[in-house]
């Protein structure tokens, strides 16, 4: 679940597409302080799973159906995106409950 409150703005650094999916590489700062493989990150409100990460970037796979049904298809390198980590249990609840699953 997400609160709908944007934690930071990230930047698309690379998009790799193949027959079954696209892989987004996203530059970020604040959320990178506590990120793990498998974490859920809302990217422009759409829940994506972290598949890899480095010091200042993370990657997420996006299935073609998700691309076809969302504005993620409009992204290109250099695009700015809204980022939010999933709400932690017992964490502060300052927005409203949002599920970003397609």
Residues covered by each model-derived region:
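Conserved loop->alpha-helix
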Residues: 1-102
């Amino acid at each position: 679940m997400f609160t709908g409150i944007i934690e930071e703005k990230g930047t698309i650094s690379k998009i790799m597409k193949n027959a079954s999916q696209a892989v987004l590489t996203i530059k970020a700062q604040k959320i990178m302080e506590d990120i793990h493989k498998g974490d859920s990150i809302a990217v422009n409100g759409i829940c994506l799973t972290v598949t890899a990460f480095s010091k200042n970037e993370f990657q997420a796979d996006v299935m073609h159906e998700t691309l076809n049904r969302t504005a993620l298809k409009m992204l290109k390198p250099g695009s700015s995106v809204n980022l939010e980590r999933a709400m932690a249990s017992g964490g502060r609840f300052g927005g409203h409950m949002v599920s970003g699953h397609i």
